[in-house]
Amino acid sequence: MSTDMKTSNKYMSLAAITLAFSFTFLSRYIWSPLMADVSGEFGINATQAGLYMSAFFAGYLVTQIPGGIMADRYQPKYILIACTILGGAMTALMSRITSYEMGLVIRVITGISSGCVMAQCSKVVALTFAPQERASAMGVVLASPPFGITLAQSLGAPLNQAFGWRTTFVIVGAVAVGV
């Protein structure tokens, strides 16, 4: 493989993992601009609405260490793809909730899928970039949180206003498939 092809591939990998990590933040923070409408439809109080974020982070927390172990043992690219697709599917599935409890379960599963992502991204950087390039590559990856949060906060309300909260969840979930 030519040097140009290797360079192109590593930057394509960097773009892919950055988008995947960004999606985890988009999917977790899209709840904020949709919260009022969902809460109104289901009679969810502020404490219950806050628990939707906590449910996500509970799932996220329990997969941090297993995600790192999987990154060391298996192909991180495939784990990253599976986690991103599962996260997208769960985000889209939020559009179909019929009860508060169903939403909690979906948010936990979304957190579980997202919790493995950072370890996979780190492993891809370690495998793809030379030691002297890794900090720069990780700098790009670590721009994902504010990027994903900015997308959620800036697009969530207009999408909700234009299409409703259910369709907004579907749109955000579909983004994962595109990643």
Stretch-by-stretch model annotation:
Residues 141-179:
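Helix-loop-helix hairpin linking two adjacent transmembrane segments in secondary transporters
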Residues 13-46, 67:
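Extracytoplasmic
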Residues 60, 84-91, 110, 175-179:
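MFS 12-TM fold signature
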Residues 29, 57-65, 149-150:
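Residue-level signature of mid-helix packing/kink "hotspots" within the transmembrane helices
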Residues 106-145:
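Cytoplasmic helix-loop-helix junction between adjacent transmembrane helices
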Residues 25, 29, 111-119, 150:
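Small-residue-rich segments within alpha-helical transmembrane domains of MFS-like 12-TM solute carriers
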